[in-house]
């Protein structure tokens, strides 16, 4: 396996990532989309590529502009998930897909975790030639995403209306990139990002009928079905959908990484007629 740090340009900041290649000719490719406040070197984007490469797939795990919570690079200008916008996340995934196409892989498998899974559904709906989609605890998205998360103590908690009103006032005053502290994960968000999340987040279930390729949807048994609607997506999907509920498993697959590897790799090997290379 070979791995190369890469940088994909956008109209603002570049997308950093790690590109993996199998030894010899690749049988196909996969794009991996991370979840909220995460990045390409943690979670599923860290532990899946080695197994995907054994299937003969070239893989790109990359940061969207909305990675981590807050970060800087070669300046003191902040960036990261606190500033993310849905339209930028959608375009970042398209930029990564174009980057893969330039390397000879115009139709990669799409794999997304959590928020990356929701964005993966939007991407595949827009790219019907996608051969397969793997959703790892993809959330439901939609216009009630902030309220739904607040019921679990995330983000604004019981202060949704208060913080939304504050965010609207800040945007009107030209302070859209100023940060608001929240009582729950992810703890800090810009005013414009907060409002964008409330109104512009794609709806996973509304988009499901447009997904016609084979889909794998994984959810841990410790995750609420209402937030990660695997069965409902499967009922609405435009193509076949395999639902896997993993026992003793949280949202980040802690301690269950090998199980997730096995489920994803065996499903892809069946769907794409691939064989796992022996060590």
Regions found by a protein language model. Name each.
Residues 211, 217-219:
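Short beta-strand/loop motif that positions the catalytic acidic residue
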Residues 1-24:
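N-terminal cap/lid segment of alpha/beta-hydrolase-fold proteins
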Residues 80-102:
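Alpha/beta-hydrolase active-site loop
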Residues 221-242:
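Conserved loop-alpha-helix segment in the C-terminal half of the alpha/beta-hydrolase fold
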Residues 249-261:
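Catalytic histidine-centered segment of alpha/beta-hydrolase-like enzymes
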Residues 134-144:
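Active-site nucleophile loop of the alpha/beta-hydrolase fold
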Residues 49-75:
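Conserved alpha/beta-hydrolase
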Residues 37-49, 228-229:
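The serine-hydrolase catalytic nucleophile loop
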């Amino acid at each position: 396996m070979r791995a190369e740090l890469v940088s994909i340009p956008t109209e603002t900041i570049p997308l950093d990532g790690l590109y993996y290649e199998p030894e010899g000719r690749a049988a196909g490719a996969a794009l991996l989309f991370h979840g909220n406040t995460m990045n390409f070197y943690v979670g599923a984007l860290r532990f899946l590529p080695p197994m995907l490469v054994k299937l003969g797939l070239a893989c790109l795990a990359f940061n969207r502009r909305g990675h981590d919570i807050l970060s800087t690079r070669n300046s003191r200008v902040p960036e990261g998930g606190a500033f993310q916008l849905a339209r930028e996340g959608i375009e970042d995934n398209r930029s990564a897909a174009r980057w893969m196409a330039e390397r000879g892989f115009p139709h990669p498998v799409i794999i997304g975790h959590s928020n990356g899974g929701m964005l993966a559904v939007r991407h595949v709906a827009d790219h019907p030639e996608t051969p397969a989609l793997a959703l790892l605890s993809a959330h439901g998205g939609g216009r009630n995403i902030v309220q739904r998360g607040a019921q679990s103590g995330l983000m604004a908690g019981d202060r949704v209306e208060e913080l939304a009103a504050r965010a609207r006032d800040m945007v009107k005053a030209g302070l859209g990139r100023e940060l608001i502290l929240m009582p729950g994960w992810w703890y800090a968000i810009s005013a414009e990002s907060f409002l964008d999340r409330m109104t512009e987040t794609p709806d996973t279930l509304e988009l499901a009928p447009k997904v016609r390729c084979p889909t794998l949807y994984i959810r841990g048994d410790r995750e609420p079905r209402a937030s990660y609607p695997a069965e409902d997506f499967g009922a609405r999907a435009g193509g076949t959908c395999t639902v896997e509920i993993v026992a003793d498993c949280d949202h980040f697959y802690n301690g269950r990484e090998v199980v997730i590897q096995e489920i994803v790799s065996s499903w892809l090997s069946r769907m794409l007629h691939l064989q796992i290379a022996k060590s």
